[in-house]
């Protein structure tokens, strides 16, 4: 066991990225069933479609899984309400400041992880109270950071 496996209650310290268009319930549940942490990517989903994916994921696995939510999502209030209503226990946030939603999620018993592209963003995420950060360099798809992963 290590800190990652303990935090997420998973067998292996492997986390599948919450990629827009590619990370629905099928991939998330497969990764979770294999012992990692699967993530549903909410970024391209309408709120009710996300609800369906969460419900299908819960039927497909009894293992932990999470949802990745870009902070710039236009219907973020509805998305966060669905996450809470459906009992999701892990949320990864990205593409914006997690400060607005971190307290709300943590008050509901949800583990919050923020994806950052620089050390300064990591410090801001820490100040916001997230449980962990994922550092991604400019090599990662869909991210605007200027630093490589090796310098983070």
Explain the meaning of each model-derived region.
Residues 1-152:
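Active-site entrance/lid segments in N-terminal catalytic domains of soluble metabolic enzymes
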């Amino acid at each position: 066991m290590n800190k990652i496996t303990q935090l997420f209650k998973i067998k292996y310290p492997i986390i599948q990225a919450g990629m827009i268009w590619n990370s629905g319930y099928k991939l998330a549940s497969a990764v979770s069933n294999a012992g990692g942490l699967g993530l549903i990517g909410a970024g391209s989903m309408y709120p009710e479609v996300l609800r369906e994916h969460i419900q299908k994921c819960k039927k497909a696995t009894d293992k932990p899984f999470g949802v990745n939510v870009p902070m710039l999502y236009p219907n973020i209030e509805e998305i966060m309400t669905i996450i809470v209503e459906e009992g999701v226990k892990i949320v990864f946030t990205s593409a914006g400041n997690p400060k607005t939603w971190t307290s709300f999620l943590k008050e509901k018993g949800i583990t919050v992880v923020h994806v950052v592209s620089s050390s300064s963003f990591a410090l801001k995420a820490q100040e916001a109270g997230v449980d962990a950060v994922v550092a991604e360099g400019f090599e990662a798809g869909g991210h605007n950071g200027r630093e490589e992963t090796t310098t983070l």
